Amino acid sequence: MIKVICVGTIKERYFKEAAEEYKKRLSRWTKIEEIEIKEEDENKYRNVEMLLKKEAEKILKHIKEGQYVVVFDINGTQLSSEEFAELLDRKVSKGEEIVFVIGGSNGLADAIKKRANLLISFSKLTFPHQLFRILVYEQIYRGFTIIKGIKYHK
């Protein structure tokens, strides 16, 4: 099973449709669960660290002992699509649950990064949150097509 925990919501219909399409495609190979964590209001907190701590508490409630946690972070390791597919294959073939965590506009608290088994960076570039979620789903889908030998990845 794959769980995707996201801070923030998708607002635009076309991003929602893209996410739903990838989740539908993935459903033939794995169960996929998406959890949206409401992004905290910056005006309620004295500083960003307190805001991130509150979001981290909400995220950690959805992560169980024994789950393999992958956090997306600009300072993480960059993987090729084939390496990402190998990671998926190793975990899914053993029946392990993988949890992908996507931070909000303020990033993620250190507590989440410390809980991660792996930090992954897609790029040094900054992406809009909604678009990044689609990129994550696309890479998970691409990974499964590589694993299954389906012509999609070039």
UniProtKB/Swiss-Prot annotation:
Catalytic activity: pseudouridine(1915) in 23S rRNA + S-adenosyl-L-methionine = N(3)-methylpseudouridine(1915) in 23S rRNA + S-adenosyl-L-homocysteine + H(+)
Pfam (any one): SPOUT_MTase
SUPFAM superfamilies named in the record: alpha/beta knot
EC number(s) recorded for this UniProt protein: 2.1.1.177
InterPro entries recorded: Alpha/beta_knot_MTases, RlmH-like, tRNA_m1G_MTases_N
NCBIfam families, sorted: PRK00103.1-3, PRK00103.1-4
Subunit structure and binding partners: Homodimer.
Function per UniProt: Specifically methylates the pseudouridine at position 1915 (m3Psi1915) in 23S rRNA.
Name of the featured protein: Ribosomal RNA large subunit methyltransferase H
Organism: Caldicellulosiruptor saccharolyticus (strain ATCC 43494 / DSM 8903 / Tp8T 6331)
Gene that encodes it: rlmH
